[in-house]
């Protein structure tokens, strides 16, 4: 039996309230569950009463192989009960070909400008030394 720690919606229309429950993955979202281990009231401002967790029971179910859903994993991560893996930046977020070409051209122009500035700074420093020698 595969178990999930997930949200079960309660509350009235446009006034959501969620129970954090341990349920079989095949059970309906708001239906049969094994145990209620917390609650989440998104209507409250961000404070300690917004998310309530029974830490002892959550640790028990995590040790027994229950997998939290994404939203519940966020709550557990904030409470320090589970570690949420860092998401890698997908390839889609990388700049396109033209943008990369523009970046490379900008870097090259910046390096050339820096080299020219260094050469200009070095040339006047050498000139007075030659005048002083003559």
UniProtKB/Swiss-Prot annotation:
Gene Ontology MF terms in the entry: structural constituent of ribosome
Record keyword Methyltransferase present: no
UniProt superkingdom: Bacteria
Compositionally biased spans, kind Basic and acidic residues: 91-101
Listed InterPro entries: Ribosomal_bS16, Ribosomal_bS16_dom_sf
Region annotation Disordered: where it falls in the sequence: 81-134
Compositionally biased residues, Low complexity: 116-134
GO biological process entries: translation
Keyword Ribosomal protein: yes
NCBIfam families: S16 (TIGR00002)
Family: Belongs to the bacterial ribosomal protein bS16 family.
Protein's name according to its UniProt entry: Small ribosomal subunit protein bS16
Lineage, broadest ranks: Bacteria, Pseudomonadati, Pseudomonadota, Alphaproteobacteria, Hyphomicrobiales
Underlying gene: rpsP
């Amino acid at each position: 039996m595969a178990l999930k720690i997930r949200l079960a919606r309660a509350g009235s229309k446009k006034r959501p309230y969620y129970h954090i429950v341990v349920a079989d993955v095949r059970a309906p979202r708001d239906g049969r569950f094994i145990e209620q281990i917390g609650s989440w009231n998104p209507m409250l401002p961000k404070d300690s009463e917004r998310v309530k967790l029974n830490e002892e029971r959550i640790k028990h179910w995590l040790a027994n192989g229950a997998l939290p859903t994404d939203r519940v994993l966020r709550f557990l991560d904030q409470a320090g009960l589970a570690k949420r893996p860092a998401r890698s930046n997908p390839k889609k977020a990388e700049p396109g070909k033209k943008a990369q070409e523009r970046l490379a051209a900008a870097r090259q122009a910046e390096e050339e400008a820096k080299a020219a500035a260094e050469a200009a700074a070095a040339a006047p420093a050498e000139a007075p030394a030659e005048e002083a020698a003559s």
